[in-house]
Amino acid sequence: RPSTGPRPGRPRTGCPSRAPPRGGGGGARAAPAPQPGVSDLPALVEQMREAGLPARLATEGEPRALPAGVDLAAYRLVQEGLTNSLRHAGARARAEVTLRYGPRELEVGVADDGRGAAQEELSGTSGHGLVGIRERVALYGGILSVGPLAGGGFEVRAKFPLKDGQ
């Protein structure tokens, strides 16, 4: 019996397809979505408020363009810090995000007045969030401090070095 097309389970070979390419053709790919940065922090803080965490953003110094990696790392630190506050700080906790532009560094932090964190969270054995933040901060030459606050609550804070003009 003569073949009338490719057999099931076998790729078609030999004859080029006459059908237009899938996805609109032309070979053009969609541009990747831009990475978030510190300019997106007001929207992130608002999302956390809507999710039930009273949060505010305080900015000190003159905002300026940051190296892309530092910009993303700072955003991710705040995202992780606020997410942890929402999950672990307790029903009545509040969070504050601080962003300080210094002449040669960017300092970014999240502090809450909640319950704090369990030791396994601090050591990085109960998830990957803080481990990922440690790695991102180190990648850009920053210094990370994570831990309970003296009066209760918890803080995640990083300082990223900036070159002149950044």
Please give the residue ranges for each predicted region.
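Glycine-rich ATP/GTP-binding catalytic cores of kinases/NTPases
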Residues: 2-166
